[in-house]
């Protein structure tokens, strides 16, 4: 909890800040925190699962989205980028310590779950025409290849975000952008049907 550390502030020079941050353009403030102990995976609520996400910016943004939408845990395949990568930490904009992140074998995890499994895919059903449950697993796939075939086989439903542009020349959405839209739809639907 941040409250315990409010009095522990240190002023550093711009040069020191650049050394600490490892980024070309560091923020003016850097937070330090202990890497939390692994908590057991929850088996309820809405859980986001990431299959082979490679881009640190995407993972950091998805962590921030989980925080925004009140999703307390994120499950990642073992080959997803490390959540403590400096670029992930920066992109999460302070949300990282509030989200429980688990790296695990997705096939084993999904086979043990009793929640409905939704996969985001370009060829899925229109998400805007579906009633979405409060408790589910939403799987988002790799930036270039989507969700792997071995994971797709475990899905109960495949959903997509329809395109509305007339020319439809854009190939796909960025995985973090798609995650934002789908999480909004899961949460919006749950508010409508309370």
Regions found by a protein language model. Name each.
Residues 119-169:
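Active-site/ligand-binding-proximal alpha/beta "capping" segment
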Residues 1-55, 187, 193-194:
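Arg/Lys-rich RNA-binding interfaces used to dock onto structured RNA substrates
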Residues 2, 40-124:
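RNA substrate-binding interface of SAM-dependent RNA methyltransferases
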Residues 14-17, 79-81, 106, 143-145, ...:
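Short, acidic/turn-prone active-site loops that include or flank metal/cofactor-
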Residues 12-13, 51, 77-78, 100, ...:
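Short beta->alpha connector loops at strand-helix junctions that form conserved
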Residues 65-69, 83-97, 149-194:
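Structured adenosyl-cofactor binding patch, chiefly the S-adenosyl-L-methionine
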Residues 4-15, 45, 115-117, 133-137, ...:
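Active-site regions of enzymes building and remodeling cell-envelope glycoconjugates
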Residues 1, 9-11, 32-33, 101-102, ...:
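Short, hydrophobic beta-strand segments that form beta-sheet elements in well-ordered domains
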